[in-house]
Amino acid sequence: MKQLNRLPNAGRTNPDQNINFTFNGKAYQGVMGDTLASALLANGVNVVGRSFKYSRPRGIVGHGAEEPNGIIQLGSGAATVPNLKVTQVELYEGLEASSVNGWPNVNFDLMGIMGWFGRLMPPGFYYKTFMYPQKLWMTYEHFIRKAAGLGKTPVEADPDVYDKLNQHCDVLVVGAGPAGLVAAREAAEAGARVIIADEQSEFGGSLLASAQTLSSVSASQWVADMVEQLNRYSNVQQLPRSTVFGYYDHNFLTILEKRTDHLGLSAGKGQQVRQR
């Protein structure tokens, strides 16, 4: 399969290892190291979703958690996961994904006709328009829910295995960009127990896409050297693919670590811990 928009010798991918996947029922091919977003863009897929309310076509504009448009349903059956962002889904063999809205499909959405009546639908109009007769609200809600463009939760029992772990540290570094890596190293050298967490699959942050030099070496080499230094410290715990999402009383923080999400079917359902 041709990936017409694939840049040669660019990015942090391995072009020698192809990965097959499907999006909205159509087969595509990406390479090792792709996210679903980069694989779709390489294949010329520009429309990945539809806007709320007016169902206008939307494409990928971000490269991480900030992506507002590329919301997808991943997998099927009991293992399906709703409302993931294409920029945060690592590509794996056999991946199946679909847009969460757009009927009959994301490229031709009949709900797009709503844009013609925009002047008649100010923000919050549905809270007034669909109040009466009250007994029909459940009928109204059914169609409003479909127009909202949200994913579907599975009704079967979750086949995956999850874990929880309590860890203690003196310093928690959130984000493994250049500042985070230096902070973790300095704290480790001082003898502190350090946990450094980053939501990406690799440490480096903005330097992963940088062509600048630091300390007379390339940005990517500088990151590799810093990670190697951290590996030497027994008092440092590195957590890639980990999102720090809560800061509570008594310096209690919560982290979600994705352990096997990037492996897909090869991880074996129910055989390994998926997240903790």
Feature-to-residue mapping (PLM):
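Fold-independent oxyanion-binding glycine-rich loops
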Residues: 24, 43, 75-76, 134, ...
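FAD-binding core/adjacent interface of flavoenzyme oxidoreductases
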Residues: 55-61, 96-174, 220-276
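Beta1-alpha1 glycine-rich phosphate/pyrophosphate-binding loop at the start
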Residues: 169-232, 243
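Conserved beta-strand segments of alpha/beta enzyme cores
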Residues: 46, 193, 235-237
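Short, hinge-like loop/turn segments at secondary-structure boundaries
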Residues: 67, 212-216, 257
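Signature of N-terminal electron-transfer/Fe-S-associated modules in redox systems
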Residues: 1-150, 158
